């Protein structure tokens, strides 16, 4: 557990340093050539998704030491090439880890750790020589490192796109072809879904962000919902106060088939561009 926390703090520091190096986000300059130049000159090691540390309680049930927790996520990416592969793509590795920590119980047990490595091809989406977003094709693995009846794992081929509507709004779509090899979670698609849509909004000064993520489950008109609000500490950093609400199934792998409704608060360090979900 100590190694996990130390790794999390180390990667947060790396992300803070990266935000100072890359002072200009792609959405601020829509010329395609300038966007490629920014990408090729930017650090190879970056944040991938949001990196956060939040704690909270269930909604609709009495909070107890067993159902209240701390959740944290670290997510990094290493770009392996410049944007000079076929179709102006670039090769990258990513690693994302989510932890669910029962800090209110005796001995502070880590309830579940979800490991999500992947390798993919990224692409800047350009229309009429204007940058309008990004996409990627990735092979992912996700598991919780447990054995016996507590083991959970699956693989998927993911296709995702994030498109800028303007400097304030972005929409995202992500779909996947699942390869379920975990004997204890053969019905995971019923709960973790088959595709995801999201919308991001942020103010002109980047001080306030709002995100809504909907993950479509297999049954008709059923979604897992995540709503996020963040407010920046100050204008010169990418650290934010963070509020996250989750409602549905599949928040963690161990309890993927158990319904959760959780409200948590803490802080988040965001990538320079809009967040990826």
Task: For the regions a language model picked out, list residue spans one by one.
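Long, repeat-rich segments with strong aromatic
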Residues: 205-210, 216-242
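Cleavable N-terminal export/targeting peptides
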Residues: 1-36, 274-277
């Amino acid at each position: 557990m100590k190694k996990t926390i130390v790794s999390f703090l180390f990667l947060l520091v790396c992300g803070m340093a990266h935000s100072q190096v890359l002072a200009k986000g792609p959405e601020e300059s829509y010329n395609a050539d300038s966007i490629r130049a920014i990408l090729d000159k930017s650090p190879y090691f970056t944040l991938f998704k949001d990196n956060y540390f939040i704690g909270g309680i269930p909604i609709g049930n009495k909070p107890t030491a067993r159902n209240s927790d701390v959740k944290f996520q670290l997510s990094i990416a290493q770009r392996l090439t410049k944007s000079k592969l076929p179709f102006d793509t670039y090769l990258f590795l990513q690693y994302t880890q989510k932890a669910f920590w029962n800090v209110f119980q005796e001995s502070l047990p880590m309830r579940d750790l979800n490991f999500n490595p992947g390798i993919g091809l990224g692409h800047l989406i350009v229309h009429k020589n204007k940058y309008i977003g990004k996409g990627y094709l990735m092979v992912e693995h996700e598991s919780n490192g447990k054995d016996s009846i507590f083991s959970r794992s699956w693989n998927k081929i993911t296709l995702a796109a994030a498109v800028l509507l303007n400097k304030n709004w972005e929409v995202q779509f992500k779909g996947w072809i699942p390869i379920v090899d975990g004997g204890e979670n053969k019905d995971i698609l019923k709960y973790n879904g088959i595709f995801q849509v999201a919308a991001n909004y942020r103010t002109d000064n980047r001080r306030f962000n709002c995100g809504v993520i909907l993950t479509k489950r297999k049954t008709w008109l059923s979604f897992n919902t995540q709503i996020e609000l963040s407010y920046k500490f100050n204008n010169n950093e990418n650290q934010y106060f963070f509020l996250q609400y989750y409602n549905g199934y599949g928040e963690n792998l161990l309890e993927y088939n158990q319904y959760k409704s959780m409200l948590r608060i803490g802080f988040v360090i965001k990538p320079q561009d809009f967040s990826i979900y």
